[in-house]
């Protein structure tokens, strides 16, 4: 499952349709899994770094939980599990804890579930996507959707994760406190 290719269309809207684009973005939803583990040093979370040429030199503020968009009528938790497997090559199952959803700066809503588990971050196998590269060259190249993964303490994760997802780390702490 780690070698499938997914075509991701990139289109630019004329200024006249900017309001339509904003409305569509506000309706977009993602579902993801926040995998965590306990070590002697404390709580660690599993994050992924997006692949492709735009993210190559970005590190702090570029990482994410494994997640992806899902369609209306699709079960968000099943979508989150599928995205986790597509982006990492690992399956995850067990007692999922729903976290409060977060609205991203661009309007996208993220539904996330936390689960305790472990995996070898250095062994991920991500699916691929295709895009024109270099821009306006007429050539298409394939890139991994995720180019690397890692385990981070919460302190480091807050620096690595996308700004709009920091709240998920706080939600994880709150969920663990509620669980006792």
Report the location of each language-model feature:
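The catalytic Nudix box helix
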Residues: 64-99, 153
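Alpha-helix-centered segments that form part of catalytic cores
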Residues: 139-155
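Active-site-adjacent beta-strand/loop module that shapes the phosphate/pyrophosphate-binding cleft
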Residues: 101-138, 150, 172-173
